[in-house]
Every structure is written in structure tokens, then in C-alpha cells.
């Protein structure tokens, strides 16, 4: 497994690979890898010739310096996991490599209709940072296919639109959310939970599933469903932030033409901000 931190070497390596292989997969990450990441990497390993994993804690997508500083960094452990699974290369650039000048003066990419709604309300510059770094990685690696987890659903929808808008010849493949046995979506930020909070955390998924059950049973009043879910989460000790039901393709409010919707939850539990989602096909009358 190659460990590459230099753009020139990355490009030279990919140029050599392109002479003899058909497909290159990219899996962008911020490190602190868990079983959810490994599931995504395995998908790439099973379906492409070359798998490149990027590990970069991107300062442009953090709104608070404290969060950037505290984000878990476990490079050696990450390398061991990726080597064991058969990854071909890990790209681990420094901030100076990816943003040669002052980051505040750097060119950025924005997807305005998606970056300012839902998560974007609470994290104003987050998706600008995501779109910019993913675009840079696309340009550097020039992959045939890129894998993203469905847990960060708004990010997935945004990247798909960015690919369409910027005419990238790249296939985006979504990998279903990986969960612990009790239903909690795996996340690097779960490490912020205390042992007691970790016992409570699965309630987020349970409350969401109750809402989904009622929705599929024909409940039409979405406000009633969301208000009930918010009260349940508050009762368990969460501070709800986003409780929404949106069109799964556009993330806009659902209409009679929406074929599939997505239930989106985010809530604070102590110092951990937990997010989750479930896609639902609405039964037609």
C-alpha cells in the first residue's frame, strides 16, 4: 500500500496505473476510520481495479476551530486497517498542500440551493468546504467512481448535483448506512459520547423509525409527526436540531410528485451532534 502526501507523486502514480487498468475508485475520508468506512472501502475493492482512500481533515468545512482541533486523528490505526483490506494507495496531504495560500483567500465551489438549507443553516460554510475539497480531489485523482456513505445524506445529494453541474465524468455510488447492533449509525463523532450517553444514543434511530412507520401507515399530517418526534427526543435527553421530511432527490419540501422521501434527523446529545436519515417510498392512494 502506497502512502502519498505529495500531489506530484500522486499524479505520477495514477498516470502509471492508467496505462494498464480500467477503473480507479476514490473514497474520500477525514480519517478516524470505523466499520462504516471499511464497508465503503470494501465496496470499492470489490468492483474496481485500484482503490485510493484520501484522509484529510478539511479545515474549510469546519465552522468552529474547536471542532477542527478536537476531531480525532488516528493515522497509524487507519493505515493498518486500510493495508489489511487491500487498499492500493492512501493520499494524506497536509493543509499546506491542499491550500497553498491563505485558506480564506482560496477559490471555493458552492452549490447554493443545497448548501444553505437543513444542515447548512446550522453550519453556514460547511458545504462550501465539502464541495471545494471534493472537487479538488476529483481533479487530482480523476477517478472513474467515487463512493460515499448515505449517512451524510445532504452531502451525498450535494455531491451528485456538483458532478452534474460541473460535468464530471464520474459515477457516484451511495453505500447504505452501517449501524451498530442497537441501531446507532456509526460515526467518528460517536467517540464524543459518554458511556451513559452511548446507551441513550440509539433512541435517535428508534424515534425516527417510529415516525417512518406512522408515515407509511398513512399519517398525512407531517407537522404532527415531527412535533411528536421532537418531544420524544427531548424526553430522552436530546436537543433536537433538524427534524425534516424532504424529497430524497432534491431535498426540497415534498410534493405530490415526490416518489421517494427522506426523513432527516440531527440532534445534540451532550457534546456529540448526531445525524441520521431513512429513505421512504410513500404508498400511493
Swiss-Prot record:
The keyword ATP-binding applies. It catalyses: (R)-pantoate + beta-alanine + ATP = (R)-pantothenate + AMP + diphosphate + H(+). The active site is at residue 37. GO terms for molecular function: ATP binding; pantoate-beta-alanine ligase activity. It is found in: Cytoplasm. InterPro entries: Pantoate_ligase, Pantoate_ligase_C, Rossmann-like_a/b/a_fold. Beta-alanine binds at residue 61. Its EC number is 6.3.2.1. Keywords: ATP-binding, Cytoplasm, Ligase, Nucleotide-binding, Pantothenate biosynthesis. Gene3D superfamilies: HUPs, Pantoate-beta-alanine ligase, C-terminal domain. Pathway: Cofactor biosynthesis; (R)-pantothenate biosynthesis; (R)-pantothenate from (R)-pantoate and beta-alanine: step 1/1. (R)-pantoate binds at residues 61, 155. One of its GO terms (biological process) is pantothenate biosynthetic process. Coiled coil: none annotated. One of its GO terms (cellular component) is cytosol. ATP binds at residues 30-37, 149-152, 178, 186-189. Belongs to the pantothenate synthetase family. Catalyzes the condensation of pantoate with beta-alanine in an ATP-dependent reaction via a pantoyl-adenylate intermediate. Homodimer. The reaction proceeds by a bi uni uni bi ping pong mechanism. This is Pantothenate synthetase. It comes from Baumannia cicadellinicola subsp. Homalodisca coagulata. The gene is panC.
